[in-house]
Structures are given as C-alpha cells and as structure tokens.
Amino acid sequence: MVQNIAILGASGYTGAELVRLIATHPSMRIVALSGDRKAGMAMAEVFPFLRHLDLPRLQKIEEIDFSSVDLAFCALPHATSQAVIAGLPRDLKIVDLSADFRLRDPAAYETWYGKPHAAPELQKEAVYGLTEFYRDEIRAARLVAGTGCNAATGQYAIRPLIEAGVIDLDDILIDLKAGVSGAGRSLKENLLHAELSEGTHAYSAGGRHRHLGEFDQEFSKIAGRPVQVRFTPHLTPMNRGILANVYVKGDPQAVHRALTERYLTETFLEVLPFGALPSTRDIRGSNYVHIGVIGDRVPGCAMVVAVLDNLCKGSSGQAIQNANLMLGLDEAEGLRLAPVFP
C-alpha cells in the first residue's frame, strides 16, 4: 500500500532532500508540498535538479487538504513548527525536522532556545528520533522529533560507550567539523563564497551550541546521572557532511569492541576495523554512518571518529527512516542508496 506524504517547508535544503529520497521510495507518494513564500511555483523553479520529477506545485500550508495525507514531514524553521503542528489534524502522523520537540524538559528548551515552548503538550508527546535507540517508541508515536545533525553524529560515537561503561563520563570532548548546508538556505553574509571558501572557523564555542542540550539530555538519561560534554563545532567549506573527533578516556580496544557489538546488526551503522578512520567523502548523499577508533599517545585514551551526511542521515534520511517505522514499513525502505563519489 502506497502512503500519501506531505512535506511542509519543501523549499529548503532538508525539504529538497526529502523530495529527492522519497521520489524513489516504493511505498511513499508525495501529494502535497508547502513553501509559503514560493506558493504557486513548481519545484523545478525552486530546485532545477528536481525538474524530471512529477511533483505537485508548492502551496501555502492552509491550502493543503490533509484528509488524504498519511504522514507529514515538517521541515519548517525552528520555532515555526510549534504553531503549525499544533494546528494540524490530531490523527496525522508527523515527523518534525526542526529543533522544536527534541528537548523533553520545558525548562531546558527555554534555556537553550531563549523563550518558553509554545506547545508544551506536544513537547511531552514527541519521541526523540534517533532511530537505532528509540525504535519501539517511534513505531508507536504520532509525533517524532528529528535529532540535530551534530547531536546525532556525536551520539552515534558515544552512546554505546556510555551503555557499556567503558569510558570516563567526566572527560568527553567532541571536536566537530560541519558542512555549510547545515546552516540552511537563507542568505547570510558569513556563508557567502568569498567569506567561507579556503577557511574554517569555530562557532557557538564555549558551551553555547544548542545541540549541547540534546547531549545533556540523552547522555544523562543513559548514565542515570548528569553528564556534560565539551563540544565545539567548526564550519568548513564543504556542502555536505559532518566529521566528529571524539576524545575519551577508556581502553581503545574496549571502545572499539563496544561500538562494534552495538552496531553489528544495524543497516546504516558501519564500524571500521581498529585503526581505520572514516571520511565524509565516503558517505556523501547517503543514510550511512561510518565510525573509526584509534588509540591515543596518552595511555588509556582513545579517539572515536564518526562521519555522516548532515542532510541525509543527519536530517531527512533519518526522518524517512523514522517515518518508515511509524507507517509499519521496513525502516530501511527507500534509503539503501549508495553514497555519491567522488
């Protein structure tokens, strides 16, 4: 049975990535696309690379008839999703790609996002969408909150190590490099080619990045006590991709073994042989995560390197993986695409 899909916010990068992936999904059909500022336009006018697809024209959200929609992806900006989702039919399954429902604690949300949550009841209802760790909850959910792309990368490297008890919880450092598409499609001076090309810089440093809220929430939940990591992201002049260097105190072989055992049966998680390190070029355009482990020159320390595509596994691909579960499908359906290389 083919499921009818609506994509709200289809004129942004994550919306376009959803369209690209769903276009070849055997059990999903796009029946509605929204882009309020581009309503009435064809997707080919907004994204010429989608020209060959037979897609509905962009509409305003209030113009969409949701009575025939089985699931909606909400790829709207942060803070916008709250009001929009609150106005959607209560029986509609929703995967939200914004930050609006990732944090369960209203006080934590206000701390990291600077204002009270506008839909606290939905915040309580939402299930955190890190698929490999919340499958059962996602299957039963009506509303799933997509993870932050940086938060997902760090968690794939660290969660199994906390679960296995093989690292010091008080000494975790995440040094992360992210592609520019993670900043969205809107025009920003610091994202102009001349400003970004041939350089890289740290941003939201000193414990100010909002994805720290997700790390705090998830790692503390696993450990059963507060866990705070040090995390600094860097913007790099590549379109797609995230690479996280994670420094931990723990036996390198035990770290590698914990990751290998945890992800042994996972379709999209690949732990490389000990000593081999992954590259963003090897996962570009795919839903795969590659993880490598090496020992440090300091005895009893290890470095874990994780890479994923921020637009795919870090956002739209994982959203589809979650939607598959919510719709009773094989979670990997439509997502077994080989990475794009070179």
UniProtKB/Swiss-Prot annotation:
Active-site residues per Swiss-Prot or TrEMBL entry: 149
Single GO cellular component term: cytoplasm
Protein name (record): N-acetyl-gamma-glutamyl-phosphate reductase
GO biological process, one term: L-arginine biosynthetic process
Keywords assigned: Amino-acid biosynthesis, Arginine biosynthesis, Cytoplasm, NADP, Oxidoreductase
SUPFAM superfamilies (UniProt xref): Glyceraldehyde-3-phosphate dehydrogenase-like, C-terminal domain, NAD(P)-binding Rossmann-fold domains
HAMAP family: ArgC_type1 (MF_00150)
Family of this protein: Belongs to the NAGSA dehydrogenase family. Type 1 subfamily.
Pathway in which the depicted protein is active: Amino-acid biosynthesis; L-arginine biosynthesis; N(2)-acetyl-L-ornithine from L-glutamate: step 3/4
Listed EC numbers: 1.2.1.38
Functional note: Catalyzes the NADPH-dependent reduction of N-acetyl-5-glutamyl phosphate to yield N-acetyl-L-glutamate 5-semialdehyde.
Primary location recorded for the protein, binned into one broad class: cytoplasm
Catalytic reactions on record: N-acetyl-L-glutamate 5-semialdehyde + phosphate + NADP(+) = N-acetyl-L-glutamyl 5-phosphate + NADPH + H(+)
One MF annotation (Gene Ontology) recorded for this entry: NAD binding
Top enzyme class: oxidoreductase
